[in-house]
Amino acid sequence: MHLPEPDPARLAKKEAAVKALLAVLPRECVLHSAEDLIAYECDGVSAYRQAPMAVVLPRSTDEVSAVMKILHGLELPVVPWGAGTGLSGGALPLGDGVTVALAKMRRILDIDLDNGCAVVQPGVTNARISQAVATEGFYYAPDPSSQIACSIGGNVAENSGGVHCLKYGVTTNNLLGLEVVLADGEVLRVGGKSLDAPGYDLMGLLTGSEGLLGIITEVTVRLLRKPETARAVLAVFDTVEASGQAVADVIAAGMVPAGMEIMDKLAIEASEDYAKAGYPVGKEAILLIEHDGPEVEVDYLLQRTEVVLRAAGATEIRVSKSEKERLLFWAGRKAAFPAMGRISPDYYCMDGTIPRGALAKVLGKIRELSGSYDLRVANVFHAGDGNLHPLLLYDGNVPGELEKAEQMGAEILKLCVDVGGVLTGEHGVGIEKRDLMTYQFNERDLDAMQYVKCSFDAESLLNPGKMFPVLRRCAEFGSMHIHGGKVPFPELERF
């Protein structure tokens, strides 16, 4: 993927920008030396790197607002940065822009158990919210695999899911309110501690907007009571396709587990070597299922689940006998991504979502593509809601390997759309899927999205070059369109 050269006219504003930023932030919160910027060259997609012109680390909403007013006045682009764990290049810096990193905004501002919510700054990690209320018997439901590191602000920007999103929903289903700083520094508040508010669902619009509409500075999250009982099932299958069909069978039987995850042979081996979760090494696939709720209900659901799994061809079924064993089952799954480092120098992670009934077909096609491209694939994903995460293993030191992985990844995502699915489930579009947006959306769809973007950010200064596969500023909007699924002037830079 081509990354553009920085605009000399913008680079010429660096000295003025740094001087103005130092007037509203302490020196340690304004980074502009080459050494300091290295840590911000990329997000979780390390294949694409580009150092920003500068990085600022505001500590409050007021400081974010002051920063945005300065950068807006200088007409410099801004890239919001949470924890840098994103997997679509959504936080990839701009060489002629400023990264606004929110790591210093990591305070839990309020815990209101009477109303079942907490108010937190965007730099608070996902897992820390649950840790803060665990002794009171509460927790925050969305649990991405990176929950010990990823920030709640980033979760909102990407509308992150997690292992338990099948039953409890993704980020947008667990939010009550947001505070956002717009491109010109204006502060916007939407929602609150009440369940709903009149008017348009602006909170729903901002959630998943990938930093294109504003910078999240405060989040009110919904807290849930911990279920009385939670138990996990580990089922072994002879093929990945059979495990995929079992997922559809369980849901068709009228059950909605808290979580359903599939891992194939390669993912099993890597995760077991890394996490020692007791996974059956050498088996083709495992399906993890968790039921939670009152103990009597969970026991009944486990019995029904076992019947369905055996009918679907499960060769072995284990049910967690203790909380320690349940957590161990999930520890292996959540270690899958970092475990890939033991078997491959690099991986390229896809994020398409498909109807559950198409799981077997799509998994079979991915197996075929793996052979065609001569790239190993480790499948590990949220099976309950059809959110695929095939990890394409490659070596970035070998010329052409990254490009081959990109091409194969594009074919997988197109396949997801072809069977009635979508390009992304929780990782976002970023730059990774940007040029595939024309495959899922027509010209009118993209026009509507661009109009929304322009209404919030008329100068296109917030995270430019992400999500939209067209080269245009909002002032030029309407002068260039997509025809026949293709972008005109493809040779032009798109940042």
Positions of the model-derived regions?
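N-terminal flexible segment immediately upstream of the FAD-binding catalytic core
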Residues: 1-69, 86-116, 145, 267-276, ...
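Alpha-helix capping/hinge segments and adjacent helical runs
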Residues: 26-27, 417-429, 453-454, 458-465
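Feature of Fe-S/electron-transfer and energy-metabolism proteins
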Residues: 1-15, 35-42, 55-63, 69-73, ...
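A glycine- and small-aliphatic-rich helix-loop capping segment at beta-alpha/alpha-beta transitions
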Residues: 88-106, 134-138, 161-172, 219-225, ...
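C-terminal substrate-recognition/cap domain of FAD-linked oxidoreductases
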Residues: 31-41, 221-225, 231, 235-408, ...
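FAD-binding subdomain of flavoenzyme oxidoreductases
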Residues: 107-261, 479-483, 489-495
